[in-house]
A protein has these predicted regions:
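C-terminal, loop-rich substrate-recognition/catalytic regions characterized by aromatic stacking residues
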Residues: 1-288
Length: 288
């Protein structure tokens, strides 16, 4: 495709590329969830040529987090927040993602979200979901496939004991267990981070009022993934993803100059007044 484009516009070859549809995307998913001949997860995928981006007919659907750890389209009920402690001295290690540099310590792409010596800072082989500073919210097993294609935003309602801290969000495709993956395979799809002081503007930092519930909009990288039957859609919330993103010491000091760190007590709210949710761009399953 790219060679045809350059042939047309650099060499003047009339090959009809200017009549192609303007958007080409690869939708991940649809594989067997078993190991392929190279020992890698067969996640599958297919190419699509489309007329516009985001896709016409996209249904932007809020999936709400709930106190019981579930994720779904129903509105949350009154509940106490879910809390965790963020310790900058023990950050959540980066496990794949859309990285393009430092591949010796941050392998890019999709990985099972569990400890591995390939990842910088991993000290065990436990699932990242076992960490006390990672909140996990997931759907029940899907009864029909769900295609997510387009921009993704997490609206987070949270409070912190710190005047500045970070919050992270990660969208995960949870594959069901099988003979190759007895514990299933929790594959990262997209993620991002927000620094509290820049929640409203990168030009005008604004510190937090400790303990005050605050709205954060975390914009994840756009993606295209087909969550298959039997899979689960999962959202992880935490406060670090290192070394992909630098560690926030929680002090509110000048960036990169603070030699001290402090713990941050984080509270994620999920009630009718503070409905933390991820907006997923759902595509009708009859798209060709």
């Amino acid at each position: 495709y790219r060679l045809r484009w350059f042939d047309r516009w650099l060499k003047g070859i009339d090959n009809g590329v200017d009549g192609d549809k303007p958007v080409r995307l690869f939708t991940m998913g649809g594989g067997t969830s078993r190991k392929d001949r190279n020992g890698k997860l067969d996640h599958g995928g297919s190419w699509h040529d489309i007329d516009d981006w985001p896709l016409p007919g996209t249904q932007y659907t809020p999936y709400h987090v709930h106190a019981d750890g579930s994720l779904g389209v129903t509105q949350p009920e009154p509940s106490q927040p879910t809390c965790y402690t963020y310790d900058p001295r023990d950050p959540v290690p980066t496990m794949g993602g859309g990285v393009s540099a430092a591949n010796d310590i941050m392998p890019p792409g999709g990985f099972d979200q569990r400890g591995d010596t390939r990842f910088y800072g991993c000290h065990d082989t436990l699932p990242v979901a076992a960490r006390s500073d990672v909140l996990v919210f997931q759907t029940t097993e899907l009864q029909e496939p769900v295609e997510v294609t387009g921009p993704i935003t997490v609206r987070l309602w949270a409070a912190s004991s710190a005047i500045d801290t970070d919050f992270t969000a990660k969208l995960i495709d949870v594959h069901p267990a099988n003979a190759d993956y007895p514990d299933g395979f929790s594959q990262n799809i997209s993620d991002s981070i927000i620094r509290a002081r820049y929640r409203n503007s990168r030009d005008t930092p604004q510190m937090l009022t400790p303990g005050q519930i605050t709205q954060f909009d975390i914009v994840l990288y756009p993606t295209s993934n087909l969550f298959g039957v039997g899979h689960r859609i999962r959202l992880d919330i935490s406060s670090s993803n290192f070394p992909r993103f630098d560690i926030n010491p929680n002090t509110g000091g000048a960036l990169g100059q603070d030699r001290r760190v402090q713990l941050a007590e984080q509270a994620v709210h999920h009630d009718p007044e503070h409905p933390t949710h991820v907006v997923l761009p759902i595509i009708p399953t009859d798209r060709q």
